[in-house]
Amino acid sequence: MNKYDKNSLKAEEFINDGEILDSLKFADENKNNLELVDKIIEKARLKKGINHREASVLLACEDKERIKEIYNLARQIKKDFYGDRIVMFAPLYFSNYCVNGCVYCPYHAKNKHICRKKLTQDEVRKEVIALQDMGHKRLAIEAGEDPVNNPIEYILDCIKTIYSVNHRNGAIRRVNVNIAATTVENYKKLKEAGIGTYILFQETYNKKSYEQLHPTGPKHNYNYHTEAMDRAMQGGIDDVGIGVLFGLELYRYELAGLLMHAEHLEAVHGVGPHTISVPRIKAADDINPDDFDNGIDDETFAKIVAIIRIAVPYTGMIISTRESESVRKKVLELGISQISGGSRTSVGGYDEPESEEENSAQFDVSDNRSLDEVVRWLMNLGYIPSFCTACYREGRTGDRFMSLCKSGQIQNCCHPNALMTLEEYLVDYASDDTRNVGQKLIEQELEKIPNEKVRSIAKEHIFDIRNNNKRDFRF
């Protein structure tokens, strides 16, 4: 019998089934213990986070006044750590060849309906030009697991190609990587290639369910997959991103496992997850979400986002175009700090949108708006769309980023950097309507920069971006 130990490097000890079940039992027994709930909320107000057991109690609590408090606290913590900034990114799919048998993913090896594709380096270049012409500066690259079609050398070549493209004023300044669990040696290669965050979704933390959902292929190995972030950090990658696919297993189990993973990374490596993603299972070729019994409604989803935000206040939280405009609006205020815009989930979908017959997408997109529309929508809601990648390029990663974030000092860099990168977007890519909204917003936000010297420099840089065609300023 494995014992719970967040300092262990063994998956079944730092994500311990017995500890999760005990935590859920404790939460059930105490969900109406309002004195305890209030103590947990008060602890969360310190903005140092709460543990998986405490978060489980809040998730189980159904008292309307307490839930309202949780939401208000999540809003405040989001504001304190991330201000009104929302980081923009887009996914880029290289290949949907895959040897795994994941039953919830249309890339699974037995799916004969889907059109298999793999981009050449010339096609990668065309995709990047299309993404740069939209205005994107940050990508999350994706590929199925296939050692023949998608070896690490192919991924590295694609990353090199992405960074080499500078079309007009365009540049991809940060490439985050979402590929299958791999070796320390391969993580070292990714680090040397200059990646930003290494992202790997756990899918589910329940080992029994995990093995049933991944019946064949290398991904079947629960321990190897779950221990991937430790290998990534051993390989020198500073920033890692975790997440589960909500709907595969009971959401209360998943939240506890997710937070235990964050606690483990913090305990062992001194740095918790740079990002946490919260995807929900969605329709796709050969995949019907109704086949899975653990789907969650929008209100439960919002509560999960709020609790993750107060449990792990420093982490970036990501939501994709899997979610509708209305859902994205609701969870933005509760904790989300990064969203995608103008996304294509097919292989090669940016340069030439594919026909229905080609059908290479990983999931159906719920928010089909263009990046320009999403940017304008965010600004009209009072947010600052940010295309900033300065921390990564200034070496503010890993524990250096976390210390700045936890102290609140990151705002002194991020606010002006967000405004400068937004100005770049407005000048180079935005529609007239979006540009008008954005430049008014920038003028208002510049006056909110508390440091007079920083404010003055930011104004000078924005003038140069707007009038002198200068780019890539950063604090």
Q: What label would you give each PLM region?
A:
Residues 82-123:
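Canonical Radical SAM [4Fe-4S] cluster-binding loop centered on the CxxxCxxC motif
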Residues 38, 42, 46-86:
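An N-cap/entry alpha-helix motif that binds or orients negatively charged groups
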Residues 213-219, 290-294, 360:
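Short glycine-enriched, charge-decorated loop/helix-capping segments at active-site entrances
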Residues 143, 197, 223-287, 297-326, ...:
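Conserved C-terminal portion of the radical SAM core fold
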Residues 90, 128, 156-163, 187, ...:
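Generic structural signal for well-ordered alpha-helices
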Residues 109-126, 130-233, 239-248, 270-277, ...:
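Core AdoMet radical
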Residues 1-39, 43, 329-334, 343-475:
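Radical SAM enzyme core and accessory elements
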